[in-house]
Amino acid sequence: MNLPAHTALFTPSWHAELELGYGRFYDCTRPTQRRHKGPLRVQKHLYAEGPEVCQHIIVHPPGGIAGGDRLDISVNVGAHAWAQLTSPGAAKWYRAASPAFQQLELHVQPGATLEWLPQETIVFSNAQAELTTRIELHGDARLCYWDVVALGRPASGERFEHGHFQSHLDIRRDGTLLWHERQRIIGADGLLDSPIGLDGKTVFATLLLTGDVDSDLLEVCRSLSMPSPVRGNLTQLPGLIVARCLADEALHARAWLIEIWKRLRPALLGREAVMPRIWNT
């Protein structure tokens, strides 16, 4: 039976938790903690780049997040370890009669590196998605974090007409605020089509990478030629590079982020970019 767009789906809610820890042992990063509750877990760790970088793929078997669901993810990357976390596909926030929540707590210890590189988040019309991310960097810890959000499902003729998407992101280094952002997007809000908002685009994406690069590399990134219509730019803040873009499709936005990541990763993290194989499936 097909339900009209305004009808909420009533399903049992889940409270899922995932705790991950990583440590450096000689020249190898190894998982030191893996605890899960409910339908949230990681697949076997991989070493596509060799033993220094431990890659985990976070999976949520239900395939989507509905009203009343809550996902809590906690990650601690120990001193001098390197963890790269991604996902096998898009996270889908379904239409619902009540809010659903995701909370991330990410800690990166001195000398450690965390790459948080999930695939896109799709927010259905009538969804009530509320996300909170807190990241604490200690000492000279390094971070590469990105987020791709797609509102509605234009390919299916669904605009983001009802519901809301709410996001809160804090990044601190040794307790000092490095980046703070709050956003709340309401279905059918005028900012969705306004030139000072999303300007009719349905996808927005952000990449945050700690460190400083010279103006030449920034210009190289700004002048990237993309085969699809993506509007993006970069800003160098003290100790943090911010890259943002607007696009019509999540695939295009993610392709732009990947090209930026490929150029900035060697300069700031000291390793050539190797795309996780899961992105090609």
UniProtKB/Swiss-Prot annotation:
Pfam families: UreD
GO molecular function: nickel cation binding
GO cellular component: cytoplasm
Coiled coil ranges: none
Broad class of where this protein is predominantly found: cytoplasm
Compartment(s): Cytoplasm
InterPro entries found in the cross-reference section: UreD
Keywords for the protein's UniProt record, in alphabetical order: Chaperone, Cytoplasm, Nickel insertion
Family to which this protein belongs: Belongs to the UreD family.
PANTHER family: UREASE ACCESSORY PROTEIN D
Function: Required for maturation of urease via the functional incorporation of the urease nickel metallocenter.
Subunit structure: UreD, UreF and UreG form a complex that acts as a GTP-hydrolysis-dependent molecular chaperone, activating the urease apoprotein by helping to assemble the nickel containing metallocenter of UreC. The UreE protein probably delivers the nickel.
Name this protein carries in UniProt: Urease accessory protein UreD 2
Gene source species: Pseudomonas syringae pv. tomato (strain ATCC BAA-871 / DC3000)
